[in-house]
């Protein structure tokens, strides 16, 4: 039996979100409310694709169409919003034997691809999967250029206490965190205003480095407003009653991710080390088994993250383009053209 692909509409939001919750690859950003936020702030058209075998759902694949002049571009996730991963999320395949699982997976993916080609006919397609999406062969078998990318996770299922957790870090953060315990600082879960403040701090840091920010305050606060309470959670470190730094965490119940934040602080308090440690303690308190330090692809940044002794996980970026778009991208690389179209072609991850 073939896989039938349809587009979920807003009336099916609850059903879609149940699929997200059931899928090992489902993330905060797969939720229907989050997808609508991505649509609102990317200027893209959203297609939440659902694959069915008969009446049984086998997977979801949210994609976004962007148009620049004569070109149609498809992204999952859309670029320039700081979203680390999206892509396909599979349903009810873990209990299948390997042969049947691979067959169902491939048919679902190729049916979605057929829908995309028939309805959008893009010249360029770019997908970044979640690290739970372990088999990227369907992309490679359908003419995508597939590349591995990396992120860091810290397993916390054994629920270490504060000192046990510190003891797992390298020498430098162990010393810094222990030495800071007599300082008058606090780390607390914040509110919407703190979400906006942390986001603006990240934006300011990008601009100080002459880099283009990949998110906006309006986008992140809309996510905070629309997703279930506690899904987007600001963690704020204050010293003597004044905000110093903070992280924006996302929480799916089985994984907490440090998504945004951690702008450099010029002071003698190890503020970012402390707020990261408290983020992990927050995960332990909520009985969440994984804390993710999103992104392990930039050497300068990994040097800082690695001192918390994380484990690496692999996810995949997959790109497919027509000959004309390959020529345009090659021209961009050679000339460093900063046009709006070409700046979208290679989403960057930390």
Regions found by a protein language model. Give the residues of each.
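A conserved beta-strand-loop-helix scaffold within acyl/acetyltransferase catalytic domains
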Residues: 3-70, 130-151, 157-159, 164-268
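Short, acidic/turn-prone active-site loops that include or flank metal/cofactor-
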Residues: 79, 213, 263, 317-320
């Amino acid at each position: 039996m073939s896989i039938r692909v349809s587009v979920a509409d807003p009336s099916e939001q609850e059903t879609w979100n149940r699929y997200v919750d059931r899928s090992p690859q489902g993330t905060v950003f797969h939720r229907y409310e989050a997808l609508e936020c991505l649509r609102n702030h990317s200027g893209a058209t959203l297609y939440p694709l659902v694959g069915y075998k008969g009446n049984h759902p086998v997977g979801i694949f949210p994609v976004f169409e962007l148009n620049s002049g004569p070109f149609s571009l498809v992204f999952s996730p859309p670029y320039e919003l700081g979203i680390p991963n999206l892509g396909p999320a599979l349903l009810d395949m873990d209990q299948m034997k390997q042969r049947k699982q691979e067959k169902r997976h491939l048919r679902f993916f190729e049916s979605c691809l057929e829908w995309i080609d028939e309805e959008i006919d893009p010249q360029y397609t770019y997908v970044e999967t979640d690290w739970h999406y372990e088999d990227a062969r369907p992309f490679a078998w359908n003419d995508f250029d597939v590349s591995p990318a990396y992120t860091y996770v810290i397993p916390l299922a054994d629920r270490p206490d504060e000192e046990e957790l510190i003891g797992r870090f390298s020498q430098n953060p162990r010393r810094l965190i222990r030495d800071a315990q007599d300082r008058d600082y606090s780390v607390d879960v914040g509110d919407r205003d703190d979400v906006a403040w942390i986001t603006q701090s990240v934006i300011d840091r990008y601009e100080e480095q002459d880099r283009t920010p990949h998110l906006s305050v309006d986008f992140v606060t809309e996510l905070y407003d629309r997703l279930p309470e506690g899904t987007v959670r600001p963690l704020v470190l204050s010293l003597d009653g004044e905000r110093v730094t903070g992280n924006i965490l996302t929480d799916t119940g089985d994984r907490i991710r440090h998504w945004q934040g951690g702008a450099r602080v010029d002071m003698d308090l190890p503020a970012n080390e402390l707020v990261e440690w408290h983020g992990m303690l927050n995960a332990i308190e909520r009985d969440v088994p994984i804390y993710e330090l999103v992104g392990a692809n930039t050497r300068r940044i990994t040097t800082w993250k690695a001192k918390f002794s994380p484990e690496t996980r692999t996810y995949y970026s997959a790109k497919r383009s027509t000959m004309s778009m390959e020529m345009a991208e090659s021209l961009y690389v050679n000339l460093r053209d900063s046009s709006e179209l070409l700046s979208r072609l290679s989403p960057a991850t930390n």
